Design a protein with these regions (language model features):
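P-loop NTPase switch/coupling surface
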Residues: 1-183
Length: 183
């Protein structure tokens, strides 16, 4: 799975922003770099992508689970609603590259909905991964991690007293939030 692009509507200081990630048709590089002054919105971009990806992780674990909602505090001051849309490319069951799109939205309290949430392609994508894992429990899952500036370490055990077994899906625990636990 590779993020192709994402768009923000009324998030932070961005009223309407679309970002394509490398590699793009005009730029064959494999790296995307965000450069800007303090307060220019780099973290808003990354947090928005992380918020959208929490829905992938949640739906991969349980069919109807919700990811992290868009916080009302990040909605543009002059707007009543916000949306984050993400497009990822991945193989489908026929081993063909396919684009999957999903959109999450947030309305200010007691305000009319401006955008609609769209999750059907996300559900298709997570269903494919569930089927792959069901067929072969050693199937690869996408690597997803987010390390914000304020990420903190909750607990580091000095001695590991027992041997633990982990499922691949457990790797997503705390991968997109601000804390890490080494237990």
């Amino acid at each position: 799975m590779q993020i192709h692009s994402f768009s923000l509507k009324n998030i932070g200081q961005f009223q309407d922003l679309s970002v394509s990630l490398a590699p793009a048709q005009d730029y064959p590089s494999n790296i995307t770099v965000f450069i800007g002054n303090n307060g220019s919105g780099k973290t808003s971009l990354l947090k928005s992508v992380a918020t959208a990806l929490t829905w992938f992780v949640a739906r991969l674990k349980h069919d109807k689970s919700n990811g992290t909602p868009i916080p009302e505090s990040v909605i543009l001051n002059t707007a009543n609603a916000a949306a984050v849309e993400i497009i990822v490319n991945d193989q489908n069951l026929q081993q063909q590259i396919q684009a999957y799109t999903w959109r999450i939205t947030k309305n200010r309290t007691a305000r009319k909905a401006e955008f609609s949430t769209y999750l059907s392609e996300l559900n298709q994508l997570t269903d494919y991964y569930k089927q792959w894992l069901g067929d072969d429990d050693q199937s690869s899952l996408p690597l997803i991690a987010f390390y914000p500036v304020e990420r903190s370490v909750i607990d580091i055990p000095l001695k590991i007293r027992e041997k633990h077994q982990f499922l691949q899906i457990d790797g997503y625990d705390n991968a997109l939030n601000n804390a890490v636990d080494f237990r």
